[in-house]
């Protein structure tokens, strides 16, 4: 099935033939749906701290970050902005020349409100000897869009989201990359330093480095901080093979195998190389201007405080279990912590012998830990917090995407639809064990939680294998705590017109 040429191509990517055969088998057989106990809710898997508790956790975080621990802000930023402009690309090829759809009208009616307006105007003058207003008056709407999206203009159709101008300020507009630098200074710093790591695509790496080089010093001075900015790319070894509809390997026109990026779950390899005590994770496009950053900063400190508080308890319990000297009451206390604080429940725990119980508790405590902010469901697309069964029969908190739900199971579909909260990708993670060693994060992935999607290339249908999502199956075997955070902390930009929302103005 695989030729000598195929094997060479496979090894050049850092993949083994066995991995390719396993992926083809997964594409053919699909993935099992997860067994779900319930959608998480407040009091059943989601912790909603009150004002006093929030202050306590902020204080815990302030104390922890002042003790010299290494904190890193990890930002997945490889996404191209092309999807943001899908509607405008459609306008460019439409058989009409004036804004017709509601989206097109909203864009042009409010074009002066965008942070990129001055740069766009300059490009229009350079290419068409007219400003945006004049081109609109002349009915040359498509020229305006071309100057925004195409290489002759600002090239926003090809740039990464992280480098587009999002927000207006008196001292000039800011990109999401800059907003993340500011956030790092405000909640993810320690000892006068802020470490921030962007995962970027190979094509955009130099652009990011250039922009950071231009901007970092300004924010260092403004916030009296030193930034350590690093970058990594998604590894080719995490790409997955594409298949034809009959499950045979899909081949390019030159006969080579087609490999595709395996989705954001591949970033576990990048995260695994981060040496830090605490890692904040948030998507590149979920940023707001300074005037409403306070609530984001507050709740980042809250969830970080909850993390370091829970981690300290877990470490203390592990050290106690290591001594071999503990009382029945202490074991009961550890069981309560594992079941109530970490949400790991084993229905037949009382049937375990003493030695088995200690092994079980050690196993459940000694793993990476994450606190996930979740927001009230307002109909935004995305995954949600659930309580799910694991292979060992235990139940634990998991973030599920709709693709992981069995659509033929009416009860599960109802749980997903009626879920009170959803996942805005607001995580803070602890990736070291109680002896100070880094966990090997790929060991904690549930490999049975990927999914198959239908795509096409050059008009030919294909099956694509998506790895378990970074905050889904890839962190399946982590200890997970869900915490309710305000909806105001979630302001993603999925289309260019989202920048017109009040939060981004």
Predicted segments, located by residue:
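OB-fold and OB-like single-stranded nucleic-acid-recognition modules
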Residues: 291-292, 312, 316, 326-505
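Domain-scale recognition of functional cores that engage charged ligands
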Residues: 8-10, 29-32, 36-378, 387-388, ...
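Polybasic, low-complexity association/targeting segments
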Residues: 1-34
